[in-house]
């Protein structure tokens, strides 16, 4: 179900509760999992900000958060945002976007934590910790609890590597070419950041591969196929990280 706006946080919570009741009746014990792209940008828009009744807090976008050079501030943002997500019935954040901003021509440049791999790694870790960790009375087990939201880091193995800055949502952006032959650098925000948290949840709970074909990056099988179908990139490199 794609739901892109609601009347108010109350309506969103009621909608979520009704969806949960529906799946509980199926008897398989699998809950509904409502997810959302980032909702806290400073600019108000109908879908993400006004679409939640206008009550959600507003923050700088990802590139702005990174420009603070303050991972602790980003962690605090994650804590606040996760509480608001849960109030709306959202259990999974389709964020953070932790691609390195390799090419300024890329249309999703502003959704990254910038070009510096060390800064992007630290901010990615803080963001995921903030979203996923519940503490004190809100914790149920191992850092997870009533204020936890699954963080889906994206885009493995680096979405800022498109040929000439073209975006892979479109056919003309099919190839990730990794200027500078820097695959290892591109995955640092994943391997050293989102997968090595300071909090008890330990690592990001979900990963979204990018839609590119990471050209000539498969050093084992030599396959040039979409990232999600590349055994080396997914089974060997991602799951082995």
Regions inferred by a protein language model and the residue ranges of each:
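Glycoside hydrolase catalytic-domain context in secreted enzymes
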Residues: 1-241
């Amino acid at each position: 179900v794609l739901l892109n706006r609601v009347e108010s946080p109350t309506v969103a919570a009621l909608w979520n509760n009704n969806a949960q009741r529906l799946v509980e009746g199926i008897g398989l014990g699998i809950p509904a999992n409502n997810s959302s792209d980032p909702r806290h940008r400073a600019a108000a828009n109908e879908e993400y900000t006004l679409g939640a009744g206008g009550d959600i807090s507003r923050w700088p976008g990802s590139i702005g958060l990174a420009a603070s050079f303050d991972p602790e501030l980003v962690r605090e943002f994650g804590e606040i945002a996760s509480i608001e997500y849960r109030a709306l019935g959202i259990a999974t954040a389709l964020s953070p976007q932790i691609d390195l901003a390799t090419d300024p021509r890329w249309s999703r440049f502003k959704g990254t934590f910038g070009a510096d791999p060390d800064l992007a790694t630290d901010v990615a870790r803080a963001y995921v910790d903030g979203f996923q960790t519940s503490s004190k009375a809100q914790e149920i087990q191992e850092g997870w609890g009533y204020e936890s939201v699954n963080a889906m880091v994206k885009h493995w193995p680096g979405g800022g590597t498109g040929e000439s800055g073209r975006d892979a949502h479109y056919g003309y952006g099919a190839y990730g070419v990794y200027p500078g032959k820097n695959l290892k650098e591109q995955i640092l925000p994943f391997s050293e950041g989102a997968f090595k948290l300071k909090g008890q949840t330990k690592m990001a709970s979900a990963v979204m591969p990018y839609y590119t074909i990471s050209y000539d990056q498969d050093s084992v099988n030599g396959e040039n196929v979409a990232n999600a179908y590349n055994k080396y990139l997914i089974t060997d490199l991602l799951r082995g990280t």
